[in-house]
Amino acid sequence: MKHHFLHYMDQVIHNRWRDIAFVDYGEKVQYTHGEVAQQVRRFHHLFRLLGIQQGDKIAIASRNCSNWVVAYTAIISYKAVAVTLLQDFKAEDLARLIEHSDSKMLIVGPYVWRDLQHQALPQLQAIMSMDDFSFIHLAEGYKGNVEHVMTEESTLSENTFFSLVQDGEIDVDSLALINYTSGSTGSPKGVMVSHRSLSNNVEDGLHILPVEPGQRVVSMLPLAHMFGQLADFLYPFSAGATIYYLTKAPTPSILLKAMADVKPYLVATVPLVIEKIHKKKLDPLLSKTVLKVCWHTPLVMNFIRNHVRKSLVKAFGGHVRYFLCGGAAMNPVVEKCLLDKRSASERRRQDQPC
């Protein structure tokens, strides 16, 4: 590991201060890199006023959105520990995990809070709404002292020296994250993740899958999962990509429209999503008898499969360079469509822009 991933984020924020970093697709919320820096600075001030120390736990339970990643960045760079919780967990499980993790603060979305508000959460010093960073609850002693912090005018500007980490370097072997998964037995389990682990994965991504600043990503995977957190946030943001977050369930119609609008360079997903797109866009074509025969005819098979592959790439916006797909085995037919086994010279000669 050469650098902590926050080092790369610092460089991106400095170099792309006025450029868009995060967007809630189809909604009005978006952040420039400079606005991310300003909001992180507000959060750090808030944490100090709440008496939150380095190593204290702060839980996040919400849908994917730009505010989620801003809050996460603030927590990690403050040297507190982020506790990421899936919004689909049952309210009683969420309450138990918040207590189990010894979290002192909760940042929660309205969908989650609708049921969670009926649970006892006595250990929390503050509960904040993910939608607008307003307070839902403050423990006695803090009321009247901190409500103004998240709306204060920022003194940071493009020419101001800024670093996400303000108080010395981070111990890379210290705890950064507790990630609660659904668990193979149906009972959520916590995985403890260090700063070193996150940074190694980010650096591997930057090395293996190079990104040009300003390239776009559509995020459809849950940010509370490690796959989505790394592929749809930490790695592309560290490289200067602009990330569009789907705030609704990624149905084929929503996803296809987002892909056509955004034209991402990278798609991180699970096999089921690609198979649904394949079924929606290509099954009507491939169900024709003549194509069924051609599919297994050596002389024309590669031509047909290349056409199908290009159609799939076009369905994902036409600019996709990388598919990251994990979590389960992919349908072999779909996989063969995506794998391009032609030589580099053949690809240059035969392919046209989608």
Feature roles, as predicted:
Residues 1-21, 38, 176:
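A short N-terminal helical cap/helix-turn-helix that marks the beginning
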Residues 18, 129, 147-180, 187, ...:
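Conserved pre-ATP/AMP-binding loop-to-beta segment of ANL
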Residues 21-65, 69-73, 90-95, 195:
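Conserved AMP-binding/adenylate-forming core of the ANL superfamily
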Residues 32-34, 176-202:
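Conserved AMP-binding A3 loop
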Residues 57, 63-83, 87-91, 99-105, ...:
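A short helix-loop-beta submotif of the ANL/AMP-binding
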Residues 77-153:
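Structural core segment of the AMP-binding/adenylate-forming
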Residues 87-121, 201-218, 251-265:
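Conserved ATP-dependent adenylate/AMP-binding module captured primarily in the ANL superfamily
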Residues 199-216, 223-311, 319, 341:
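Conserved AMP-binding/adenylation subdomain of ANL enzymes
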